[in-house]
């Protein structure tokens, strides 16, 4: 084998090693954790969940006595070091925005408490968290009361800035599937200080969310 060929082979092997190392680091960045009412796929480098998944059901919303909202934001006990993020949020002006909403666990104390784990939080501008994001949460619960079961996925992408160990995402998304009607809805919100402009103005085709998030959405038959 000629010296020149050996050099090309060595270079090729080095490039492959770099590629595999990069892919390995990328794969290890996220971890999926299952809790009682939701599962979260958390990015350790970004400090926010890239995907959270759960069901909203009529049975889970209707009970004689609703549980008391916990309001204690704490690290996820299954990922304590990476989700010890309270100091990152303090004094920064961002809401600790729920992905899986506490109100979706109105009848389950454990699920309500688990909704306040930082593995379920995203740094959202108050205008989004208390505006269109909240409106969509309420609309989803209304749909569950009417149609019994709704499957929900949501997450965030990108980075505007860093606050401590937490990235403030550029956009937050949500996908909703109504089991009874087999209807899909997808929404994409810019994470900024603009006032709410209505859900219709943020509705997008499902494939847009699949492209930006890297996830495929389907229902297990």
Predicted segments, located by residue:
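N-terminal Sec-pathway targeting helices
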Residues: 1-13
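Short amphipathic alpha-helical "recognition" segments used for binding
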Residues: 8-10, 40, 178
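Hydrophobic h-region of N-terminal signal peptides that target proteins for export
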Residues: 15-24
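Boundary at the C-terminal end of the N-terminal hydrophobic targeting segment
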Residues: 25-30
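Short, His- and charge-rich active-site/binding loops that engage polyanionic ligands
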Residues: 33-95
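Domain-level detector of nuclease and nuclease-like folds
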Residues: 77-221
């Amino acid at each position: 084998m000629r010296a020149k060929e050996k050099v090309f082979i060595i270079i090729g092997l080095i490039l492959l090693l770099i590629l595999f190392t990069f892919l390995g680091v990328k794969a290890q960045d996220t971890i999926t954790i299952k809790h009682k009412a939701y599962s979260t796929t958390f990015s350790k480098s970004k400090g926010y969940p890239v995907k959270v998944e759960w069901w909203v059901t009529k049975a889970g919303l209707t009970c004689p006595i609703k549980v008391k909202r916990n309001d204690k934001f704490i690290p996820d006990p299954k990922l304590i070091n990476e989700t010890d993020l309270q100091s990152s949020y303090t004094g920064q002006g961002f809401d600790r925005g729920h992905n899986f909403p506490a109100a979706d666990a109105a009848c389950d104390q454990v699920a309500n408490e688990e909704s306040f784990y930082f593995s379920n939080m995203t740094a959202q501008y108050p205008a989004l968290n208390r505006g269109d994001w909240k409106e969509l949460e309420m609309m989803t619960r209304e749909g569950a009361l009417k149609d019994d079961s709704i499957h929900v996925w949501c997450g965030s992408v990108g980075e505007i800035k860093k606050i401590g160990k937490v990235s403030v995402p550029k956009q937050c998304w949500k996908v909703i599937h109504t089991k009874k009607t087999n209807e899909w809805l997808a929404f994409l919100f810019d994470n900024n200080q603009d006032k709410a402009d209505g859900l219709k103005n943020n509705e997008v085709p499902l494939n847009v969310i699949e492209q930006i998030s890297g996830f495929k959405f389907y229902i297990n038959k």
